[in-house]
Structure formats: structure tokens, C-alpha cells
Amino acid sequence: MLKQAKGRIGRNAVLLALFEEEEEGKITAHLDNLQWRYCKGKVGSMELQKIVASVETAAKRNNVVNGELYREMHALYHAVVEAVQGVTRGQVELGDLMRTVGLRFAVVRGNPYENSKEGEWIAVALYGTIGAPIRGLEHETIGLGINHI
């Protein structure tokens, strides 16, 4: 069974991605209390590969995942792609369609289930803007991907 709302991994990833730096103290303290690993970052691109690379690099540098363990990187990759599908409304294309994104991202890793035997999960939240590569013509977007490790 899932933990109570404050222990839900996707919810926490979305909140971390949404909060500005000056607002995030409460959520990071909560994640520390849960003993979950997390990181934040920003990426702007017209290419999916750059989004994936930015999230993976941040997660490795902040010890959210071990870059030498295939299963951890594979779980992260699928969570990122699922989140991008939300951002792009299921059409995982950017530059070819003359779309660009400016995103904040959060990666959260932990055990969102009351039964610890369910294992660790990873969530990737993306929040920002998407649109034509003309400043001011974009709109807000959000995506969430969750995968087991």
C-alpha cells in the first residue's frame, strides 16, 4: 500500500520541481527526514537527448543513482522519457516540430510503500515552458515519470 500523501514519491518530485529556490526548504527537509535522495536542475533545449543527459548527469553527480549500475540508469531513463511524454503531450519530438522547452527538473528516489520489500522507486518531474522558439510565445507544461529500480 502507498504511504500517506506526504510519502508519495511523484507528489514530492512535482513539488520539488515547482518550488522556487527560496521555497524549497520545507520539501527538502521533508525528503531528508524520509531519507530519500533527490536533486534539482534546469535544462533548455530543442533536443530530447539533451534533456535526458541533463537529468542523468544531475542524478549521478548528486548520488541519486549509481552511474555504473545498469538497472539504476535504466529506471532513471524510463522515468525521464515518461516525464517528457507528459511535457510534449505524447509526441516526443521537439526540434523537428520547431518546439523548444525550458524546464526545471527534480529527481527523487525512495521507498514510497509501507512494505519496504516493495523496494526503491525513482520519480522525475519536469516543469517549465514549451512552444515555438520565440520568447514569449510558449506556455506552461508539466510531466511526471515514475519507475521502480
UniProtKB/Swiss-Prot annotation:
GO terms for biological process: L-histidine metabolic process; positive regulation of gene expression. One of its GO terms (molecular function) is mRNA binding. Keywords: Activator, Histidine metabolism, RNA-binding, Transcription, Transcription regulation. InterPro entries: Regulatory_HutP, Regulatory_HutP_bacillales, Regulatory_HutP_sf. The keyword Transcription applies. Belongs to the HutP family. This is Hut operon positive regulatory protein. It comes from Geobacillus sp. (strain WCH70).
